[in-house]
């Protein structure tokens, strides 16, 4: 005879870990070449002058300078650029 009541089998109880996406360096900040500026899924922000786009859509500085966020173009896209100092 069982001395414990039968336990239920829940189908919950798991979650994926956070991916730490978002803006890592903000407008006006000085960054070194190679610094990650934005981690994103898709192109919420587009690469402007002196900014590269990684295969996972990460934006990174290709030159040392100050970050400039701007909205431009007919589709009002958000661009991230580096103004070289």
UniProtKB/Swiss-Prot annotation:
Spans annotated as Disordered: 1-21
A GO cellular component entry from the record: cytosolic large ribosomal subunit
GO MF terms held by the record: structural constituent of ribosome
Family matches, as Pfam families: Ribosomal_L27
SUPFAM superfamilies: Ribosomal L27 protein-like
InterPro entries cross-referenced by the UniProt entry: Ribosomal_bL27, Ribosomal_bL27_CS
Biological process per Gene Ontology, one example term: translation
PROSITE patterns in UniProt: RIBOSOMAL_L27
Coiled coil: none
Keywords, comma-separated and alphabetical: Ribonucleoprotein, Ribosomal protein
Family: Belongs to the bacterial ribosomal protein bL27 family.
Protein name as annotated: Large ribosomal subunit protein bL27
Lineage: Bacteria, Pseudomonadati, Pseudomonadota, Gammaproteobacteria, Aeromonadales
């Amino acid at each position: 005879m069982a001395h414990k009541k039968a336990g239920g089998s829940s189908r919950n109880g798991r979650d994926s870990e956070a991916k730490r996406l978002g803006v890592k360096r903000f407008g006006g900040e000085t960054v070194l070449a190679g610094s990650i500026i934005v981690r994103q899924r898709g192109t919420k922000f587009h690469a402007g002058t002196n900014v590269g786009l990684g295969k996972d859509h990460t934006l990174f500085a290709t030159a040392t300078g100050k970050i400039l966020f701007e909205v431009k173009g007919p589709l009002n896209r958000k661009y991230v650029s580096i103004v070289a100092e």
